[in-house]
Amino acid sequence: PFTFAFEQVGTNCGLIGKNAAVEVDGTVYWMSENGFFRYGGQLESLPCLVEDFVFDDLNTVTKQHVNAGLNNLFGEINWFYVSSGSNTVNRVVTYNYFDSSIQRPIWTTGTLNRTAWTDSAVFGKPHATEYDTSTNGTVGSATYVQGNSDGVSIYYEHEKGLNQVKEGAESAIAANIESGDFDISITKEGGASTKGDGEFMMKISRVIPDFLSQTGDATITLNLRDFPTDVEASSALGPFTVTTSTKKIDTRARARAISLKVSNTSTSQFWKLGTFRLDIQPDGRR
């Protein structure tokens, strides 16, 4: 009898690229041409709220450039891929396996060029490389790769410090996180709840920021929209700068749908998001 054998456990779920899979505590996660999957004894399709955003903008010619990276310090699996407007890796989609549930899967998307990745189990911190087409091996007056005109790979250590260090110079690690649009519902006394779904105008008079930790300033933006086809626009008084001593922000924002964005753009800035509170009430139409 054969000691080892291969048994197929699924169809239409194969790897999109040879480096698009990663193993976490006995469970394998991977990116396919048809979505995201995992196998820990049985095949499962991962519910993904950003699937259309990723696959509608995926450069299918460069599928083999897709690579997966595990950041076990924060329970994250990253898939780095090439968007339709690029020829090199430039975007990332991240799944948080620590905090996700079937009812509430946690996904984020971002812009990040990483062509190889190894997690903290090897060096204590995640290490990764970036392919930079704008650099030809010259740093200052020194040339490290003679005759190169095709770009170089730059080696990074992640989760260290507050700034990016590249070629001896520090720059800001620009970061942001934005919620989806939210609206309000109105419950009538003695009657059924009337769902919002953009029917009611709402007014946000103030925001109480809550950061679990913060270094430097952060920026809060309320993006407003009255109709689904409207372009998001910041509230008239925003964006708002939040310092470590900010207790509340008076906003005077008004719309049918609002999303909250937290960001930073300068060096030596860091924040870890807590639970923000917003003073919201129904408002009349004009």
PLM regions and their residue ranges:
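Surface-exposed extracellular loop regions of Gram-negative outer-membrane beta-barrel proteins
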Residues: 1-10
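Beta-sheet repeat architectures centered on beta-propellers
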Residues: 13-19, 23-27, 33-286
